């Protein structure tokens, strides 16, 4: 938001408030460090060095914790790192407090060995502890947990990846698309433990012990929480209208029930047209597009209605993976579906693409990718297809680039859509 609004209104006055010294830190930059993509955590910044050192003269950065939002008086109550409490007024307030890994069912004791790695200071403190450890418990095997487990394995750590569901990335990936990843885990010193819901984590004699609902215990030097992220909206509770899941209710312009307060990013849900409901997706792309959209709106530009199709991607255990829309397992709770798993290549250049369509009319509602080479760009095209309610026939019979040996992805997508179209019509007949 800040970057876009400054571009549109260079003479505006913006006050950026954050308790973090580097609010532009890319979440979980530890992954980049452990994979050798960067040399230092300070390199894991969005677009530039630490934002606090880059504020222009007509803008202000206040490193402080917001203790309270007093909407009736347009005032914030702040506390800085020295413990000084003071007030700051505002005309327009943009709330972008993000989300944190929160659990209502995991009890943790007072220990510095239960880690989270979303923010810069947290990651710095966690890095020292991780480097001194040998065995790490990762709680949660979604995309964040899988990425962390893989990155830790590259540093020679033994990892226990503990998941409440039957398989990793249960909510984003159907079983057949995650099976090759699971097979690869054991070769990276990662032990996957499924169907075990962690209810408590305690430090006992210098070790962390995770207790599960099923009565099991698992021990390690450290535990890292990679569980569901929930919005940091506690300061707005009672100030503006909120949904039952504690996200902030906003209109089409991201305006809350208080006319001069807006909410963006992980604070809000967006409309998920595939299922016809609002859906919470705490993703970086949501933070970017809602922030940019709000900047344009406040600068006087009309913005289109925002929606989500849940585009996710990752790379771990030798595979590139992406998921768009809903899984077949989730979709079947709401509608009849037809799916096709397109498979090409051998184990060295494997390319799998699963397409899921509504059986009645062929409208695409989900897609999943698994490949040995970086084919993640195809997720963007599929995301656009889902947003526009494109059918399997539309994609199968549209023009596509064909240049032998140089446009394989376009051909694979064409073939996958054609196969899905054929299969769905055979079923209808």
Model regions and ranges:
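Cysteine/selenocysteine-centered motifs that mediate thiol-based redox chemistry or coordinate metal-sulfur cofactors
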Residues: 388-429
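Glycine-rich dinucleotide-binding loop and its adjacent helix/turn
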Residues: 92-155, 191, 244-245, 250-252
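FAD-site-proximal beta/loop scaffold in flavoenzymes
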Residues: 111-133, 217-293
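Mid-to-C-terminal Rossmann-like scaffold of FAD/NAD(P)H-dependent oxidoreductases
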Residues: 270-373, 418-429
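Beta1-alpha1 glycine-rich phosphate/pyrophosphate-binding loop at the start
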Residues: 1-59, 151-173
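Rossmann-like dinucleotide-binding cores of NAD(P)H-dependent redox enzymes
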Residues: 145-200, 285-286, 303-325
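A conserved short coil-to-beta-strand element within the FAD-binding core of flavoproteins
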Residues: 63-74, 194-206
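Core beta-strand elements of the Rossmann-like FAD/NAD(P) dinucleotide-binding domain
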Residues: 83-92, 213-222, 257
